[in-house]
């Protein structure tokens, strides 16, 4: 189905694979540029972008835990169709960016400040020079939503609007070995910092759609097939250091949300088994100009929901980008 107002084509469950092959894959080869840059501490970062010939609007994507560029092919193509230049950064330790540990399945940082530095370097060195004068939008999903919140608090003038999709602002430890996670958060033994946390699970080469964060099976299989093809996409569990860093980052993101000055849209999944809504509500209440909406029928990855929920999600996003945040209806 094509939305004439925003010039974008929505792909259903039945035609997703064919549309990706026929429309998105050629776009990736013809329009997307890839490259590397260095973060502030010299870590090598992989990035991707496509400059829209219409120019004037740019969106930067900050991905979630264990994610990589290939998971966002459809999302980036949708924004490109709507007239946006699109930029994607693979944070340190993810995808083809440099890792801090040798295990390709382990996710480790000492502090989320490292991710903030990655985003700053990407914006300053790559995005801004290519898009001067554009309206700049920040899009953060899950872990990327937490990183985006912190970035907006520290650098309130980099972006004009921001979208947080299922932002990781309060984790649901009840469904993820919470006692062991709590142990990893309070442990400060230096020799454990870069070691797998007690909740670490190695990459499983067998697909498990039923327990995934996707409601759309063809979208799940699209990204999972990429995971199987390269061990660079096998990141699957956190270190002790990452877990402690995430806990501190979520607390800071909520505490300083009042420093966010730009219009902010927070989108919640109705059936989110990874993050709790409380932290999202607190950020929405404290930020100066925020709207929050729950998308019925969606799981954690709302952009991978079934057709009805997914189209509502996009309708809310593009409406937000075109209108003042005060005009977007709130939902419970």
How would you name each of these model-derived features?
Residues 69, 76-102:
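Conserved alpha/beta-hydrolase
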Residues 296-332:
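Catalytic active-site module of serine/aspartate enzymes centered on a nucleophile-bearing elbow/loop
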Residues 262, 276-285:
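Short alpha-helix in the alpha/beta-hydrolase fold that links the catalytic acid
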Residues 260, 266-268, 272:
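Short beta-strand/loop motif that positions the catalytic acidic residue
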């Amino acid at each position: 189905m094509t939305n004439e107002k925003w010039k974008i084509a929505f792909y259903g469950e039945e035609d997703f694979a064919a549309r990706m092959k026929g429309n998105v894959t050629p776009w990736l080869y013809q329009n997307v540029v890839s490259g590397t840059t260095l973060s502030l501490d010299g870590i090598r970062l992989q990035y991707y972008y496509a400059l829209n010939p219409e120019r004037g609007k740019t969106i930067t994507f900050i991905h979630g835990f264990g994610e990589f560029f290939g998971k966002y092919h459809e999302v980036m193509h949708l924004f490109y169709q709507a007239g946006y230049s699109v930029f994607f950064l693979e944070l340190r330790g993810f995808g083809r960016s440099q890792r801090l540990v040798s295990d390709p399945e382990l996710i480790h940082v000492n502090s989320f400040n490292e991710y903030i530095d990655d985003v700053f370097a990407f914006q300053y060195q790559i995005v801004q020079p290519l898009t001067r004068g554009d309206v700049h939008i920040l899009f953060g999903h899950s872990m990327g939503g937490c990183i985006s919140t912190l970035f907006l608090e520290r650098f309130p003038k980099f972006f004009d609007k921001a979208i947080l999709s299922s932002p990781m602002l309060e984790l649901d430890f009840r469904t993820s070995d919470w006692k062991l996670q709590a142990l990893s958060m309070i442990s400060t033994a230096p020799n454990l910092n870069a070691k797998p946390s007690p909740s670490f699970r190695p990459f499983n080469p067998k697909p498990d759609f039923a327990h995934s964060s996707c409601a759309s099976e063809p979208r799940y299989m699209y990204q999972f097939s990429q995971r199987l093809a390269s061990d660079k996409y096998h990141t699957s569990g956190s270190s002790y250091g990452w877990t402690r860093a995430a806990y501190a980052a979520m607390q800071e993101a909520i505490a300083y949300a009042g420093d966010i000055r730009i219009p902010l849209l927070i989108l919640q999944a109705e059936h989110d088994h990874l993050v709790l809504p409380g932290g999202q509500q607190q950020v929405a209440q404290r930020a100066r100009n925020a709207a929050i909406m729950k998308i019925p029928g969606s799981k954690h990855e709302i952009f991978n929901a079934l057709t009805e929920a997914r189209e509502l999600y996009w309708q809310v996003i593009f409406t937000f980008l075109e209108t003042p945040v005060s005009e977007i209806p709130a939902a419970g």
